[in-house]
């Protein structure tokens, strides 16, 4: 198991307010994966745990849609999101990857004030500007940058597993 502890983000189904959170934590407990709950947001659980927790939860969960490594957390305005992206060492994050894609997902109407397609395009342009050798691949990217918009927060992540 990869023992590197990171903040991980799980995008959950929104059909029940508590069951997906319980399912995720039960899977971690039953597999003896040490974790610390950081925060619960609408359809999102943030924990501190080994990176391999993403794969374990993805393999066993029915109410988890995506498991990611949290790279940045900020206010949900485009300006704050783009600043957070630019503040990251994207060359280090993509050092073993040759291609990337960007997706933005708003949950429970928290992204109504945003133009998702434009935000994806802007984030992609900033990443491409910072990492000149990486190419955009919308079909089968080596790295998927996934931003979740929930409550008043944007969570900029590197996707590990999609269910």
Task: Please place each PLM-identified region on the residue numbering.
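Structural beta-strand/beta-sheet cores of well-ordered domains, especially the beta-sheet scaffolds
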Residues: 8, 98, 143-145, 152-154
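Glycine-rich adenosyl-nucleotide cofactor-binding module
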Residues: 148-163
């Amino acid at each position: 198991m990869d023992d590197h502890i990171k903040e991980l983000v799980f995008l959950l189904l929104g059909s029940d307010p508590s069951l997906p959170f319980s399912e995720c934590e039960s899977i971690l407990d039953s597999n003896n994966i040490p974790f610390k709950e950081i925060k619960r947001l609408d359809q999102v659980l943030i924990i501190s745990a080994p990176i391999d927790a993403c794969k374990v939860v993805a393999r066993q969960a029915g109410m988890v849609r995506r498991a990611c490594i949290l790279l940045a957390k900020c206010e949900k305005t485009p300006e704050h999101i783009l600043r957070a992206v630019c503040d990251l060492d994207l060359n280090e994050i993509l050092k073993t990857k040759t291609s990337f894609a960007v997706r933005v997902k708003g949950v429970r109407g928290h992204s109504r004030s945003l133009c998702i397609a434009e935000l994806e395009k802007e984030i992609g342009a900033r990443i491409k500007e910072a990492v000149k050798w990486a190419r955009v691949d919308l079909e089968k990217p080596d790295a998927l940058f996934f931003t979740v918009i929930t409550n008043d927060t944007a969570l900029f992540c590197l996707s590990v597993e999609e269910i």
